UniProtKB/Swiss-Prot annotation:
Entry binding sites for L-ornithine: 168, 232, 236-237
Lineage, uppermost ranks: Bacteria, Pseudomonadati, Pseudomonadota, Gammaproteobacteria, Enterobacterales
Name assigned to this protein: Ornithine carbamoyltransferase
GO cellular component: cytoplasm
Function: Reversibly catalyzes the transfer of the carbamoyl group from carbamoyl phosphate (CP) to the N(epsilon) atom of ornithine (ORN) to produce L-citrulline.
Catalysed reaction, written as an equation: carbamoyl phosphate + L-ornithine = L-citrulline + phosphate + H(+)
Pfam families: OTCace, OTCace_N
Functional pathway: Amino-acid biosynthesis; L-arginine biosynthesis; L-arginine from L-ornithine and carbamoyl phosphate: step 1/3
Length: 335
């Protein structure tokens, strides 16, 4: 029986550096097996519940395709498709679903919700995104980085995240750096830095792996020598519009544009984004931003960068599926 069997996947820091490396290696193998048409279905007869309190494209599709590839069946419970937290407590929901399903994915709000599900379900629970952490995304990011710099260890790579770093992406990048030895730089206004306690915890852990975690407002110094530039949206649909103007004004200097790409001094630097991205005005929200704030060429990233050879965001998006598959196989398959 392998060491991941029946374990939860709630946040990266629940695992050792060796375990994260194992999941990445398994992801690589599963991706190659699928491409070569030799994938072994190790989840035949398994039933998986997908709880989504927040809608999603990539996470839902990744879990569903990964499950089907491996022979499992899924039940999708959308924002209006379950009684969780409304008529039925999280604890009770966990105990009901745990009797019917072999694994449960949760994407929604507080980390405490997914932790409670894990405490009471009796089956593996996987965090598809909470307000605090997004571990399946970072697993895909690390795989993508390995693929684009095959001659380098993660511990020899420099990842720069620019923009709003006080969110689940910033938090999870801190944990990823601590576990892999990355040179991580969070380049953001101080008002957008992650929780100081988590930063200190991850900086201490990074000393054991040779990692480096830097927080700075200095864009030029922060991006110099980067292997990868990463950003995320500045505003989300659920946030009150009154906050948008102030947030955009605060973060506008941190937009990923060709000047920032050039400032890295690395002509091979790659651009990452967890998507969706506001890089043009071809969406309802993109049009709003263009009309109200004059952001016609993109918000957190310009369309020029997004569509350039630097951008590897669609390889990154594909890798969500392969890494999620690895997590499910590792935690549900006995051999």
């Amino acid at each position: 029986m392998q060491p991941f069997y029946k374990r939860h996947f709630l946040r990266l820091m629940d695992f050792t550096p060796a375990e994260i490396a194992h999941l990445l290696a398994l992801s690589t193998k599963l991706k190659a097996d699928k491409k070569n048409g030799i994938e072994t279905r190790r989840l035949q007869g398994k039933n998986i519940a997908l709880i989504f309190e927040k809608d999603s494209t990539r996470t839902r599709c990744s879990f569903e395709v990964a499950a089907y590839d491996q022979g499992a069946q899924v039940t999708y419970l959308g924002p209006s498709g379950s009684q969780i937290g409304h008529k039925e407590s999280i604890k009770d929901t966990a105990r009901v679903l745990g009797r019917m399903y072999d694994g449960i994915q949760y994407r929604g709000y507080g980390q405490q919700i997914v932790e409670t599900l894990a405490q009471y379900a009796g089956v593996p629970v996987w965090n598809g995104l909470t307000n605090e952490f997004h571990p399946t995304q970072l697993l895909a990011d690390l795989l993508t980085m390995q693929e684009y710099l095959p001659g380098k260890a993660l511990s020899d790579m420099t990842l720069v995240y620019v923009g709003d770093a006080r969110n689940n992406m910033g938090n999870t990048m801190l944990e990823a750096a601590a576990l892999t030895g990355l040179d991580l730089r969070l380049v953001a206004p101080k008002a957008c830095w992650p929780d100081a306690g988590l930063v200190a915890e991850c900086q201490a852990a990074a000393k054991q792996t040779g990692g480096s975690i830097t927080l700075t407002e200095d864009i030029a110094a922060g991006v110099a020598g980067a292997d990868f530039i990463y950003t995320d949206v500045w505003v989300s649909m659920g946030e009150p519009k009154e906050t948008w103007k102030e947030r955009i004004a605060l973060l506008k200097p941190y937009q990923v544009n060709m000047a920032m790409i050039a400032a890295t001094g690395n002509p091979q630097v790659k651009f990452l984004h967890c998507l969706p991205a506001f890089h043009d005005d071809q969406t309802t929200m993109g049009q709003q931003m263009a009309e109200q704030y004059g952001l016609h060429g993109g918000m957190e990233v310009t369309d020029e960068v997004f569509e350039s050879a630097h951008s590897i965001v669609f390889d990154q998006a594909e890798n969500r599926m392969h890494t999620i598959k690895a997590v499910m196989v590792a935690t549900l398959a006995q051999d």
